[in-house]
């Protein structure tokens, strides 16, 4: 029997973080716990203690397992920080009125996964960490992540994106990213809704001159080949509606690429390293490129896994009867080989060496 909780864990601790993520999403996926900061034994002890103290409970149905707040945890969080949690733990808000249907729960899990990876990448994602979305254009604090729920709160315009599969948007110094999470499943895209979301961002003037791109998260690199297959609902990923769409995995690799997408200067640093020994790229050439090798062949830096750009590179090489080199991280190589033709040669970067020498240096 869980004992009656008298107090919450301290703020700025992992137990409080887990309670916060659960409060904001409604249900936290069990499988995502291993992605929180800390070793497996410590994470297990945190979850065990929160259950024992009557703050979390496990909800399992139809093979899907998640953590939910107890009524005592809601009461304590509301008393501790009402300005943070009132919008989520009172009234008819979805995190406070949870349903048991699989599609609804999966959506909550996908939201939780993205909030976790944003937090791990040091991107402000909780509502109190950044300006409200309606005031984002006046705020200089970027990067910042806004959930689709926060975006919909702008007013009547928010109803235009009701059917979108986006989990939210990421504002960075390099532009705006509509963010999606396909998790382990194949995404059921809503083509018109996604384009309406893009149009809304353009008309609302959040970052008036910013380029709007997309990020889709998945569980493994193997899912990339599914995303790049012709499909009536997902062709907008490759049809030019979004000139850049990045595929990131929901793990430490994806967190690293996310950091790069948020930091233009760090990407430039990596590009300079990769360009060593190569000739300067040719702008507006018949084959998109970042550099030219000693034999005059194009080279593309593909470590961010911008798959429309990779597809354009591959298609142009085949069209013009040329060969070219695609530079990626070692963990991406096998999946990119699967989606590229014979004209593309792959060259990989050691990810662990990149972490040590560039990302956290």
Locate predicted features.
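Short acidic, hydrophobic short linear motifs in intrinsically disordered regions
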Residues: 25-36
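Short amphipathic alpha-helical interaction segments
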Residues: 36-53
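A short, conserved structural fragment
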Residues: 51-62
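Long, compositionally biased intrinsically disordered regions
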Residues: 179-187, 199-361
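Short, amphipathic alpha-helical interaction segments positioned at domain boundaries
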Residues: 72-105
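Short, cationic-aromatic polyanion-contact patches
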Residues: 10-12, 29, 61-82
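Short, Lys/Arg-enriched N-terminal segment that forms or immediately precedes the first helix
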Residues: 1-7
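Exposed, interaction-prone assembly regions rather than primary DNA-binding/catalytic cores
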Residues: 95-190
């Amino acid at each position: 029997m869980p004992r009656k909780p008298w107090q919450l864990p301290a703020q700025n601790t992992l137990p409080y973080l887990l309670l916060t993520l659960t409060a904001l999403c409604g249900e936290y996926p069990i499988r995502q716990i291993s992605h929180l900061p800390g070793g497996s034994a410590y994470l297990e002890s945190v979850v065990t203690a929160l259950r024992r103290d009557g703050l979390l409970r496990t909800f399992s149905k139809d093979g899907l397992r998640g953590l939910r707040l107890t009524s005592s945890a809601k009461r304590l969080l509301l008393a501790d920080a009402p300005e943070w949690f009132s919008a989520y733990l009172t009234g008819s808000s979805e995190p406070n009125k949870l349903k048991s249907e699989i599609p609804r729960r999966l959506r909550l899990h996908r939201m939780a996964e993205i909030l976790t990876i944003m937090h791990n990448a040091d991107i402000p994602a909780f509502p109190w960490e950044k300006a409200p979305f309606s005031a984002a254009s006046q705020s200089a604090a970027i990067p910042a992540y806004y959930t689709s729920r926060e975006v919909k709160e702008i007013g009547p315009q928010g109803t235009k994106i009701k059917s979108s599969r986006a989990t939210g948007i990421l504002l960075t110094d390099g532009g705006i990213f509509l963010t999606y999470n396909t998790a382990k499943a194949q995404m059921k895209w809503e083509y018109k809704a996604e384009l309406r979301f893009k149009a809304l961002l353009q008309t609302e003037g959040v970052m008036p001159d910013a380029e709007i791109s997309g990020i889709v998260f998945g569980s493994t690199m193997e899912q990339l080949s599914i995303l790049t297959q012709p499909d009536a609902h997902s062709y907008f990923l490759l049809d030019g509606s979004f000139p850049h769409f990045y595929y990131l995995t929901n793990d430490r690799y994806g967190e690293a690429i996310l950091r790069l997408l948020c930091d233009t200067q760090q990407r430039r640093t990596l590009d300079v390293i990769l360009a060593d020994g190569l000739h300067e790229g040719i702008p507006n050439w018949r084959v998109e490129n970042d550099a030219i090798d000693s034999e005059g062949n194009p080279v593309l830096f593909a470590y961010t896994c911008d798959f429309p750009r990779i597809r354009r590179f591959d298609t142009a090489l085949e069209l013009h009867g040329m060969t070219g080199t695609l530079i990626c991280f070692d963990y991406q190589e096998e999946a990119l080989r699967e989606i590229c033709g014979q004209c593309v040669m792959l060259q990989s970067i050691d990810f662990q060496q990149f972490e040590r020498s560039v990302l956290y240096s």
